[in-house]
């Protein structure tokens, strides 16, 4: 196992991750400091045989094949749901869906058995586990196996060229403080400046821009198979459901025009699946930043578009769980009654000091500058920094509560 003499902690540390393609470039900057676990079925079976011997490896295989469904289903639910959303005709077939689910559970059982035994060789202070997202197999298995070890979860950041690296979780499950008092406790988090760039998602190619009068309600749709929807959206279950909610809101708020932009990464469209509404328009060909700029409010489940809207000082209404669900920063609309009540607050704007402090904390302290294709060269130090930040934040919040 490759190790490093870490100059910050003064002890040897190994970073362990899976061979997930998205974070492959982490290997280059961590070089000899990292152990990469191969996750192919053959590789896991082979390693189990080398570690346990052929007889025990066969026993593990038999156990995985004859597993109790409830023991591993939670590790593969995201994979099955994603297939059903992306390929509804194929995976809507109960036989195909059940077969795929069983295969994934067998893989999860074998990988979990291997990882638990492999990780048991490490002392707690020798290892940092790097989990990409953690919501789907195989990363969900690593997240389960690494409980009790120091670990970080990684995901895209909220602004271009940034990453989330967090010891607690990512997106709505991350460690970003939800306490508005934290951001007003005296420290100027925005002193280092605020981000200036937002992510302009490429438009769906078959649509052209539409002319819109300013002052509309902008509703950015999200990828329904993404964890932001499947795990962190108790009310809105998919984009068809979201469209129905928007139409309902339009009926109950006759003075409002609602403008939807579908996420370009999701290739299926809601258009044509529901009757049109005269005050609900699609703007799939328009530029996201311009839609935010011209909107009077942004209604989102929990998209990063909400954070981008805060950067422009816009009113934001969230329907799902998010790390920016902070009192006086956004309005909550997690059911129809609350959504209508929030839409009625036409003059409401986020507390400007809180807004700047929150964005400054994200930009100057929380987010790591870099990307999956070009991770920071000092990635090891950035990972270690996130533990320090988490400890500091917890201490500050504890002091506020005393």
Swiss-Prot record:
Keyword Thylakoid in annotation: no
One Gene Ontology term from the biological process aspect of the record: nitrogen fixation
Swiss-Prot/TrEMBL keywords: Nitrogen fixation, Plasmid
Signal peptide boundaries: none
Protein name (record): Protein FixF
Organism: Sinorhizobium fredii (strain NBRC 101917 / NGR234)
Upper lineage: Bacteria, Pseudomonadati, Pseudomonadota, Alphaproteobacteria, Hyphomicrobiales
Gene from which this protein is expressed: fixF
């Amino acid at each position: 196992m490759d190790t490093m003499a870490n100059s910050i902690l003064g002890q040897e540390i190994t970073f362990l991750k899976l061979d997930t393609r998205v974070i492959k470039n982490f290997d280059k900057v961590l070089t000899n400091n990292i152990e990469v676990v191969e996750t192919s079925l053959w590789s896991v079976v082979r390693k189990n045989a080398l570690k346990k011997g052929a007889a025990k490896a066969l026993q593990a295989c038999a156990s995985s094949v004859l597993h109790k469904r409830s023991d591993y289903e939670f590790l593969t639910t995201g994979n099955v749901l994603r297939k059903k959303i992306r390929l509804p005709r194929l995976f809507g077939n109960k036989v195909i869906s059940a077969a795929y689910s069983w295969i994934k559970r067998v893989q999860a059982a074998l990988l979990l058995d291997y990882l638990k035994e492999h990780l048991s060789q490490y002392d707690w202070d020798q290892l940092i586990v790097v989990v990409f997202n953690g919501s789907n197999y195989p990363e969900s298995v690593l997240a389960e196996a690494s409980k009790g070890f120091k670990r970080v979860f990684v995901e895209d950041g909220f602004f271009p060229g940034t990453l989330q690296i967090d010891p607690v979780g990512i997106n709505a499950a991350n460690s970003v403080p939800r306490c508005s008092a934290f951001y007003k406790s005296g420290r100027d988090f925005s002193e280092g400046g605020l981000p200036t760039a937002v992510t302009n998602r490429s438009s769906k190619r078959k649509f052209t821009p539409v002319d819109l009068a300013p002052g509309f309600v902008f509703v950015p749709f999200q990828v329904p198979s993404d964890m932001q929807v499947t795990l962190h959206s108790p009310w809105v279950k998919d984009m068809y459901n979201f469209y129905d909610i928007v139409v309902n809101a339009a009926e109950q708020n006759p003075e409002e025009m609602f403008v939807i932009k579908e996420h370009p990464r999701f290739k299926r469209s809601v258009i044509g699946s529901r009757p049109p509404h005269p005050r609900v328009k699609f703007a799939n060909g328009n530029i996201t930043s311009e839609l935010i700029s011209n909107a009077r409010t942004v209604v989102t489940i929990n998209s990063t578009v909400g954070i981008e809207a805060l950067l422009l000082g816009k009113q934001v209404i969230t329907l799902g769980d998010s790390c920016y669900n902070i009192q006086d920063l956004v309005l909550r609309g997690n059911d129809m009654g609350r959504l209508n009540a929030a839409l009625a607050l036409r003059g409401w704007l986020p507390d400007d000091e809180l807004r700047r402090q929150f964005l400054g904390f994200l930009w100057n302290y929380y987010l790591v500058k870099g990307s999956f294709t070009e991770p920071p060269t000092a990635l090891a130090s950035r990972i270690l920094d996130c533990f320090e930040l988490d400890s500091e934040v917890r201490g500050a919040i504890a002091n506020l509560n005393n």
